[in-house]
Each structure stands twice: as C-alpha cells, then as structure tokens.
Amino acid sequence: MTNIRKSHPLMKIINNAFIDLPAPSNISSWWNFGSLLGICLILQILTGLFLAMHYTSDTTTAFSSVTHICRDVNYGWVIRYLHANGASMFFICLFIHVGRGLYYGSYMFLETWNIGVVLLFTVMATAFMGYVLPWGQMSFWGATVITNLLSAIPYIGTDLVEWIWGGFSVDKATLTRFFAFHFILPFIITALAAVHLLFLHETGSNNPTGISSDMDKIPFHPYYTIKDILGALFMMLILLILVLFSPDLLGDPDNYTPANPLNTPPHIKPEWYFLFAYAILRSIPNKLGGVLALVASILILILMPMLHTSKQRGMMFRPLSQCLFWMLVADLITLTWIGGQPVEHPFIIIGQLASILYFLIILVLMPITSIIENNLLKW
C-alpha cells in the first residue's frame, strides 16, 4: 500500500514541497531565510487578524482603538508589538534573502527572481499602509509625504493623488481604504509566495558553489526541516527580546502623538526599513527625479540577470566581486543612517555620494569586475 502522503492529492503537493523534496546537500544557513519569511508572514497574518478585531479605521477613533488594544485587551500589547516588530523581522529576513540571491547568483532563476521582486514591492506597500493605521503624527505625515510623491507624475499626477486620497487631503477615506488594502494584501502575498515556491521547485535550489547539484541531493525532511526549525527558534528569540524588553526601539516617538494636520513634525521619516530608499529619494533636488530614483533603487533588481557578466554563477570564488558586494552592503547601511538624519550639511552630500555609489556599484562596477575576473581565470 502506498503511503497516504504520496497518494493523497493534497498531501502529495505538501510532500513534494516540504518532505521528499530533493535538496542540495551543501546549502548553508543563508538558505534558511525563505522559510523564516514564511513564518513571519504567518505570524503577521495571525497577529494582524487579532488586531483587526479591535481596531477601528476611523480618523476619530483609530488612535484610541490602538491605545485600547494596548491597555484593555488581554495581552493586546503583546499582539500589537509582535505585529510591529514582526514587520521589522520580516524586512531583516527579506533583505538578507535578497542579499543571498545577489551574492550566490540565485537571480539566474528568472521566474523565481522576478516573482520575488514583485513580492518585495507588495510587502513594502503593505508595510507602508500598515504604518498609517495607528493614526499618529508620523502615520499621517508619512502618508501625506509618500502619497504626494505621485503628484510628480506629469499630467495625471494631481488627479492620481486625489483619487488615492479619496478627497483633497489624507483623511477618513484614505485611512479606511488603507485598512482595507492592508488587510487584503497579505493574502495576495501568500498567493505570490506559493507561485514563487512553484517556480523554485521547477529548477531546484541553487547552492553556495553555483554548480549543479543534481548528482548530490538529500531529502528536505529531516535534514532541512531541523535546520529551518533552529533558524526559526533564533528568529523568535530575537523577536521576543525586542517585544518584551524594548518594543519601541525601532518605532518613532512621534507616533505616540495623535495625528494633527495643523502641526508638522520637525523630521518626517518612514520606518527604518524604508530609510535607504528615502535617502535616495531625498538626495535628488528634483521631485520627479527623486521619485524615479526611488523606484529605480528597487526595480534595479530586475536587471540583475542582464548585468551578470561572470562565467561563474555565485561569488564564492570571486574575491573582487565579494569586495564590491560588501561595499554595497556598507553603502546601504550608510543610506539607512542618512535617511534618518535631518536634511542639512554634511548629511546631504553624504546621501548624494552614497546614492551615486549604490547605482554605480550595481550598474557599472560589478559587471566590469566580473569581466576582469573572467580574464584572470585564463592566467
């Protein structure tokens, strides 16, 4: 008799994806982050669901309802801070996951990579809308500033902004629709993640060497299920330390002040995970130019397979490219720092240099370095 997990139509799908899946025998801990992202997504949907039971998406009561969750709902503060800091963990895992893809040449799986870029955009949109919901000062002004960027689009810009706002400013209609979108998008993300996985399982996983591992596979369970559980425990430990010891470490104190359209905060800035893109946006004096640079900073990922000039897939045996990769990481950390600083000297010039370096490394230096390394192989 055949095992039920191999014969049952539904169990068969799960079996082929998580149990009997042939996986390379040498994938390192950098491959843990896909499963961690799945765990983050489930955590966010569950905590978000319980928050939505008590939240009201009305400008007059939104802020009070969040306060009510923290003060009066049983363990409401845990749910709220798990959700807020869970988003930070989500983005940490996302950035590492994308970084791993860049380092080891995983972008050569075109369909998987492109769906991944779409996922990144969708998660960023969801996080932005979620930040608006508590209706604090930074929620309101963040929403105003970011949605206003669309007015830079020629001809249709102003109409587009007012259409998104549902009026002539960020108000009740905006908050209600942002809540609706924030609720539905995680389910769209789940569907996209399933497609992401589907395309990945068509080709099989990449591995640190970048060489085909068809001749050396091991079953996903128990080897990588155990490895993923260990990674998940580490992540939950960090998340719980954040939630239970310093839940507001990554937040903005301004968001504990109710939204006031008549009073602009001195420094409007998004959550930490958007600061690198915000710094690129601010480093260009022209509004439309800034918006284009902002979009390009993420969309540039789609170009990665076309910019790949090396004969080797990953960077494991390419020391020059490794140096450039870590320069890029340092540059992104610098941009994140600059995004949180006021617009004044010396931060303006540092931001502009870091923005130029970001595009220069990806578009020019990396492809040229790969060609140099190809020639060094001949010696």
From Swiss-Prot:
Transmembrane segments: 33-53, 77-98, 113-133, 178-198, 226-246, 288-308, 320-340, 347-367
GO biological process, one term: mitochondrial electron transport, ubiquinol to cytochrome c
UniProt-reported outcome of changing I368V: In strain: IB9, IB14, IB16, Sardinian wild boar 2 and Ssc3
Disulfide bonds: none
Domain of life: Eukaryota
Sequence similarity: Belongs to the cytochrome b family.
Purpose of the protein: Component of the ubiquinol-cytochrome c reductase complex (complex III or cytochrome b-c1 complex) that is part of the mitochondrial respiratory chain. The b-c1 complex mediates electron transfer from ubiquinol to cytochrome c. Contributes to the generation of a proton gradient across the mitochondrial membrane that is then used for ATP synthesis.
Protein name: Cytochrome b
Species name: Sus scrofa
